[in-house]
């Protein structure tokens, strides 16, 4: 039984019903509908912390989905799972792939920045200030782009950019 039919959560059930109605009335191919079903099931599994199941669904959605824009969100969600699992290098790969297909994905830019910032913090702890500054500069570049796309979001990043004197080139 597909995960979307097992949801106990009212919001998930409502989303599933609305999504099913939209799939029936919108002119989409069987393949597109199937890809969306896998994507939806992946999101549901991911929300419940069932990352292995979510990845299986996302990979199947990727196999079926041909639209670059839709694929960008699948790739982004795969990146989220790898980030949650502490697999930052893998996460970056998926975020970059998502941005190749959809450069207007500020959340991917933000997550890339967060990873570089985290790595910068690790470099400081290791006593490598030169590397940390390079990583912080890289984080700043990604945050600036995310903020350019979504100016009212990422307030903490905006504050960090101001505090570290990296904002002058932003926005």
Swiss-Prot record:
SUPFAM superfamilies listed in its UniProt record: TPR-like
Biological process terms in GO annotation: photosynthesis
Keywords: Chloroplast, Membrane, Photosynthesis, Plastid, Repeat, Thylakoid, TPR repeat
Gene3D superfamilies on file: Tetratricopeptide repeat domain
Membrane topology: Peripheral membrane protein
Pfam families: TPR_1
Transmembrane portions of the chain: none
Annotated Gene Ontology cellular component terms: chloroplast thylakoid membrane
TPR repeats: 35-68, 72-105, 120-153
Location(s), subcellular: Plastid, Chloroplast thylakoid membrane
Family: Belongs to the Ycf3 family.
Record function comment: Essential for the assembly of the photosystem I (PSI) complex. May act as a chaperone-like factor to guide the assembly of the PSI subunits.
Protein's recorded name: Photosystem I assembly protein Ycf3
Native source species: Nephroselmis olivacea
């Amino acid at each position: 039984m597909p995960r979307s039919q097992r949801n106990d959560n009212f919001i998930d059930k409502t989303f599933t019903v609305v999504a099913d109605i939209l799939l029936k009335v919108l002119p989409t191919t069987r393949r597109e509908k199937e890809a969306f079903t896998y994507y939806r099931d992946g999101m549901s599994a991911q929300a419940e912390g069932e990352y292995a199941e979510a990845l299986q669904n996302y990979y199947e959605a990727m196999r079926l989905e041909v639209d670059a824009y839709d694929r960008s969100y699948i790739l982004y969600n795969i990146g989220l799972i790898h980030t949650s699992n502490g697999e930052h290098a893998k996460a970056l790969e998926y975020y970059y792939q998502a941005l190749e297909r959809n450069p207007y994905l500020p959340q991917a830019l933000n997550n890339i920045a967060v990873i570089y910032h985290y790595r910068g913090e690790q470099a400081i702890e290791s006593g490598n200030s030169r590397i940390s500054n390079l990583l912080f500069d890289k984080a700043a570049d990604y945050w600036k782009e995310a903020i350019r796309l979504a100016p009212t979001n990422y307030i903490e990043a905006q504050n960090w950019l101001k505090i570290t004197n990296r904002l002058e080139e932003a926005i």
